[in-house]
Amino acid sequence: MGTVHGDGGEDGPSWTRAAELLQDAAPITVQEGASAMTIHVHWEPGDPGTPPHRHSGPAFGYVTKGAVRFELEGEPERVVEAGGTFWEPGGDAIHYQDGNALADETTEFVVTMMCAPGKPMLELVEEEELKQRAHLRAPRPTA
């Protein structure tokens, strides 16, 4: 995606080539007093992942193995393969899917989340709210 420390060229110092930009998300909002946590998630083959939920702050993920089926409210479902990144703004947005897109391999990802003070890192969304917000979900793929 690009360099992080400027363009030192092929002959420049190694520190100008050592870091590769994988994701640049904007705008993000982090509440005063927020904390950050980084977790490693391991899904067995075909695991659908966490039920629809939201995070209290932004989350930034990197898939280390396999492929994640990712769906955020208002965005179409997509598959993020190993080496790919994802992010979500947190707050009110519903995260519908984060499961393993592969039926025969494990999937793993690392995610760093900013947690609003006094709030849980993850909150499941009740069925009633999902129905009320159905119009905000992107159209589902058809088989």
PLM segments and residue spans:
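Short histidine-centered beta-strand/loop micro-motifs
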Residues: T50-R54, L72, V79, D98-N100
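Short beta-strand/loop turn elements enriched in aromatics
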Residues: V30-G33, D47-G57
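A short, N-terminal "cap"/entry segment at the start of jelly-roll beta-barrel domains
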Residues: M1-M37, V79, E123-A143
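Ligand-binding loop in jelly-roll beta-barrel domains
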Residues: P76-E77, G90-P120
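Short, conserved beta-strand element in jelly-roll/cupin
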Residues: H42-E44, H55-F70, F109
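Short acidic-glycine-tyrosine-enriched beta hairpin
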Residues: Q31-S35, H42-E44, A67, L72-D92
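A short, acidic/glycine-rich surface segment
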Residues: Q23, D47-T50, I94-G99
